[in-house]
Amino acid sequence: MSENGFLFRFRDGQTYMDTWPERKELAPMFPEQRVIKATKFAVKVMPAVAVISVLTQMVFNNTAGLPQAIIIALFAISMPLQGFWWLGNRANTKLPPALASWYRELYQKIIESGAALEPMKSQPRYKELANILNKAFKQLDKTALERWF
């Protein structure tokens, strides 16, 4: 199986969710924060919704409603998977030119501050942007970030 395989998208989505900095400054510019919040909520709540939808039909001995309850349960179980899938696709998407130049500027700012980074990517993806943003928020002071936020 290649790195672009089906299951790798889910793994990349989970990694990207953990990597993306949850900062209020980024919320208006990127949908990641909303998707991450919805995915975390779905991971907590949707398994219970799936179980309750099936169990209520079984408790009330409603065999006619059981197929619909199973469909609802499958949909509820798929909700967190949809979030991980979206995040995995987003993590591996190349940055548009404007964001790529922003990535390069942030990279140079962090290097100038004396931090060690992995080599700059020629065609960065959103997961590299997430790593750079994390480093920027941790290493740079607020005055250095004023230009962008």
Curated annotation (Swiss-Prot):
Q: Does the keyword Transmembrane helix apply?
A: yes
Where in the cell?
Answer: Cell inner membrane
Task: Write down the membrane topology.
Answer: Multi-pass membrane protein
May I have one GO cellular component term? plasma membrane
The record lists the membrane-crossing segments as: 41-61, 69-89
- Protein family per UniProt: Belongs to the UPF0208 family.
HAMAP family named among the record's database cross-references? UPF0208
The name of this protein is UPF0208 membrane protein VF_0838
- What organism is the protein native to? Aliivibrio fischeri (strain ATCC 700601 / ES114)
